[in-house]
Curated annotation (Swiss-Prot):
EC number, UniProt record: 2.8.1.6
Protein name in UniProt: Biotin synthase
Species annotation: Carboxydothermus hydrogenoformans (strain ATCC BAA-161 / DSM 6008 / Z-2901)
Gene name per UniProt: bioB
Subunit structure: Homodimer.
Single GO term (MF): biotin synthase activity
Cited Pfam families: BATS, Radical_SAM
Length: 325
């Protein structure tokens, strides 16, 4: 296994690309070979994207009461969770959070809403455009948005008010998607990705591992992201939330998570691959290893409905690894 990992690493370092069969070979790594795989993924990350860790922060500006049935989500009306639905968050609170995250060291700030999506006619969308105009004036953060499905016209309007990157996750492989979502289709999500590209924004598109998919399906998913040529790939690790359909899913083992991160880097050598939610409960004391397994970005602060670590703890972890912020 060692020799094969090294050979495929050299192939990628020399500018080549691995195929799905070769990715499945890497997935056979176990025990110490996973650490070798992680180290080689770090070499690939160093060559293609360097040693700087991009830090993103998010804020839920409209929470809960979502009509979609995503099996993992605490905000769905199909589930019985402890989430309290809210209307649009006050503009001043959003500004205050942005300034606090900028002071803490974040590079990007993302406004997130619950629901299937928005059009340019929605009143909440018009409010969000106004908020982005203020953010562009009052902070130096790169601005991101995550508002669900999006028309091409709405995407253009976001770009015009300063949004540079749009997040819309595919969540998982096409072959597994219907096990997780039934109220909309994979192609609807892909259509939004295409609209974002047409508008000239970067695409942030990832998903969640640990929902019951196979490693083969994770690899299928990574190659879909490669084909779509997305810019940033947030990888969540399922944090099963009580009251959702996936509340009883077992956690992935830390080494399984690390192996998955590394394989994504082999498949997507020059992309921004980042930690998203779930690292605290799944990786525990091994969170640093993710950044040494090919990741070059992370969400800091709290998530949409779950708590993250203290920001300074994450910043110290990055410094301890010899990486740059």
């Amino acid at each position: 296994m060692f020799n094969r990992i090294v050979a495929l690493t050299q192939k990628v370092l020399d500018g080549g690309q691995i195929n799905q069969i070769e990715a499945l070979e890497l997935a056979q790594a176990e025990g110490a070979d996973i650490l070798i795989l992680a180290a080689m993924a770090a070499k690939i990350r160093e060559k293609y994207v360097g040693d700087k860790v991009e830090l993103c922060s998010i804020i839920s500006v409209k929470t809960g009461h979502c009509p979609e049935d995503c099996a993992f989500c605490a905000q769905s009306v199909h589930h019985h969770t402890e989430i309290t639905p809210t209307e649009m968050l006050e503009e001043e609170k959003i500004l205050a959070k942005a300034k606090a995250m900028e002071a803490a060291g974040a590079h990007r700030f993302d406004l997130v809403t619950a629901g299937l999506g928005m059009t340019e006619e929605d009143e909440d969308f018009k409010k969000i455009l106004a908020i982005y105009k203020r953010l562009r004036q009052e902070v130096k953060l790169e601005l991101c948005a995550c508002l669900g499905t999006l028309t091409e016209k709405a995407a253009m309007q976001l770009r015009e008010v300063g949004v540079t990157r749009y997040n819309h996750n595919l969540e998982t492989a096409r072959s597994f998607f219907s096990n997780i979502v039934t109220t909309h289709t994979y192609d609807e999500r892909i259509e939004t990705i295409k609209n974002v590209k047409k508008a000239g924004m970067e695409v942030c598109c990832g998903g969640i591992i640990g929902m019951g998919e196979t490693m083969e399906q994770r690899i299928e998913f990574a190659f879909t992201l490669k084909e779509l040529d997305v810019d940033a790939i947030p990888i969540n690790v399922l944090n099963p939330i009580k009251g959702t359909k996936l509340e009883n899913r077992p956690l992935l083992s830390p080494l399984e998570v690390i192996k998955t991160f590394a394989i994504f880097r082999f498949i997507l050598p020059d992309k921004n691959i980042r930690y998203a939610g779930g690292r605290e409960v799944n990786l525990r004391d091994m969170q640093a290893l993710g950044l040494m397994a090919g990741l070059n970005g992370m969400l800091i602060g709290h998530y949409l409905t779950t708590k993250g670590r203290e920001v300074e703890t994450d910043l110290q972890m990055i410094r301890d690894l010899g990486l740059k912020i």
